[in-house]
Amino acid sequence: ADNRRPIWNLGHMVNALKQIPTFLXDGANA
């Protein structure tokens, strides 16, 4: 389980980083 958590965390962070520019763009458009 300990070996899987870091990998999942990295994947989650990558997904979050991909979503951040979208939120910034939506905020700028609003």
UniProtKB/Swiss-Prot annotation:
Subcellular localization: Secreted
Cofactor entry: Mg(2+)
Keywords, in A-Z order: Cytolysis, Dermonecrotic toxin, Disulfide bond, Hemolysis, Lipid degradation, Lipid metabolism, Lyase, Magnesium, Metal-binding, Secreted, Toxin
EC number: 4.6.1.-
Sample GO molecular function, one term: phosphoric diester hydrolase activity
InterPro entries: PLC-like_Pdiesterase_TIM-brl (IPR017946)
GO cellular component terms attached to this protein's record: extracellular region
Annotated cofactor note: Binds 1 Mg(2+) ion per subunit.
Active-site residues, record numbering mapped to chain: 12
Broadest EC class assigned to this enzyme: lyase
Tissue: Expressed by the venom gland.
Primary location group: secreted
Tree of life domain: Eukaryota
PTM comment text: Contains 1 disulfide bond.
Catalytic activity: an N-(acyl)-sphingosylphosphocholine = an N-(acyl)-sphingosyl-1,3-cyclic phosphate + choline; an N-(acyl)-sphingosylphosphoethanolamine = an N-(acyl)-sphingosyl-1,3-cyclic phosphate + ethanolamine; a 1-acyl-sn-glycero-3-phosphocholine = a 1-acyl-sn-glycero-2,3-cyclic phosphate + choline; a 1-acyl-sn-glycero-3-phosphoethanolamine = a 1-acyl-sn-glycero-2,3-cyclic phosphate + ethanolamine
GO biological process: killing of cells of another organism; lipid catabolic process
Cited function: Dermonecrotic toxins cleave the phosphodiester linkage between the phosphate and headgroup of certain phospholipids (sphingolipid and lysolipid substrates), forming an alcohol (often choline) and a cyclic phosphate. This toxin acts on sphingomyelin (SM). It may also act on ceramide phosphoethanolamine (CPE), lysophosphatidylcholine (LPC) and lysophosphatidylethanolamine (LPE), but not on lysophosphatidylserine (LPS), and lysophosphatidylglycerol (LPG). It acts by transphosphatidylation, releasing exclusively cyclic phosphate products as second products.
Family recorded in the similarity comment: Belongs to the arthropod phospholipase D family. Class I subfamily.
Record protein name field: Dermonecrotic toxin LlSicTox-alphaIII-1
Species, as recorded: Loxosceles laeta
Lineage, opening ranks: Eukaryota, Metazoa, Ecdysozoa, Arthropoda, Chelicerata
